Amino acid sequence: MDVANLASQLNATTILPEGVLVISLILVLLGDITFGRSSAKWTPYLAIASLAACLYLLYTQWDQANPIGFLGSFNADNLSIVFRAIIALSTLVTILMSVRYIEQSGSSIGEFMTVLLTATVGAMFLCGAEELVMIFISLETLSIASYLMTGYMKRDSRSNEAALKYLLIGAASSAVFLYGLSLLYGLSGGKTHLDDIALALTDTSKSLALVISLVFVIASVSFKIAAVPFHQWTPDVYEGSPTPVVAFLSVGSKAAGFALAIRLLTQAFPNLVEQWQFIFTALAILSMVLGNVVAIAQTSMKRMLAYSSIGQAGFVMIGLVIGTEAGYASMVFYLLIYLFMNLGAFTCVILFSLRTGTDEIGDYAGLYLKDPLLTLALSLCLLSLGGIPPLAGFFGKLYLFWAGWQAGAYGLVLLGLITSVVSIYYYIRVIKMMVVKEPQDMSEVIKNYPSIVWKPLGMRPLQVGLVLTLIATSLAGVLSNPLLTIVNSSVADVPRFKQATIPTSIDVAIQPDTPTIAPEL
């Protein structure tokens, strides 16, 4: 094989966005080693600049002629580009919200940025990986970096406990996933590329070993997306971990898990489509019900948002279960919307904890009287998570539920509507507590609420992150047509889709034979 032919097959430009992040994390690490704590003044901005460059490079890769790189191991198609952009955006907002948090804790910002960028690179590679070894290495890169970030506050016993729990359960999940991949490798006759595995398994009967491999793979993916009953780690890890880490895990890590689910399940298990859809139907039902019901009883904002994220994962799984192009498009769109409204909520929680040192829901009582802007911001994000119009979360759920209804998943859609109403209750409860008007109803924490100051290091990035997420949460739904065009284009090459993309304008369509009312979104 000559050099030119090898270079064309490697097609290294497909991973250029990840390459920029790798260079950035090396520079951040070297800066922290060389300059110590003084590097905190510029390392976050270097990381932000590299993420902005990464997003631009992803934009330039859209609809590229040859998206396959590294001898077929990596696919930079439009679907992977959208998921990688979601992860890069979540990391960018996480950095904006974390600078002041890490600075106030007394920890090293450079080390934190290095580990966070490492997790981002692993997650982005996972979105496009099409070879078993690359899938596993990418997943482990993301997982190990996540363990390190979870226990980053070394002097906090809760952070250490969360890291240990996450490590033990995550290690078991990785072992199960690896065993599932090994079965897939053996049954396919030693193939490692997903397309080759699918081709080798085309004539294979639904053997017990193949079903076991499917179950093991789904169990590991479910752990990554925090689906019930593989969610036990989520509340404890979310409560004990640094809040910026929780924000990244709730969006970036979850998006990578769903990207892996789409690519692995639709390509590597051609004979078991009905089986994995049935399993994910059960997971979606359990996640929507348990996540939203248990969230009602929580007294900590971080634990409430943890169970909320479990319920949100159940909603997203509706798009995965129905297996249509409209389902995948609505799933990707909802993840994009979820990024802004969830990170916006966590930004508000961080800002409140920086000023008060607590995240208990009861301590938010009367916040409106002392900090009306923070109250408004958190209220908008929570209402959007609940799906209240005209905020972005409403349109995300509308597209998702309509795709499910079109595909005939009436039970899942109705359950999703019911559990959405349940979620509104615990979101409204927090808002109601914040807007009490009587001074005697204020919590002791709010009575001693400090004056609002934006001058300390890291407060301006936090302010920028909050404004960005609020603008997106408020307008992304109303101005959704460009986003829908992007997500519809991104799923055009997804295998096994069964129906057309989501329409792009609201209309009443009446067919000559069968009258139907279909909102074209």
From Swiss-Prot:
Q: Which NCBIfam families match?
A: NDH_I_N, PRK02504.1
- Keyword match Cell division: no
Keywords (A to Z) from UniProt:
Membrane, NAD, NADP, Plastoquinone, Quinone, Thylakoid, Translocase, Transmembrane, Transmembrane helix, Transport
Q: What gene name is listed for this protein?
A: ndhB
Q: How does it assemble?
A: NDH-1 can be composed of about 15 different subunits; different subcomplexes with different compositions have been identified which probably have different functions.
E.C. number(s) listed in UniProt: 7.1.1.-
Similarity-based family: Belongs to the complex I subunit 2 family.
Q: What is this protein called?
A: NAD(P)H-quinone oxidoreductase subunit 2
An annotated GO cellular component of this protein is: plasma membrane-derived thylakoid membrane
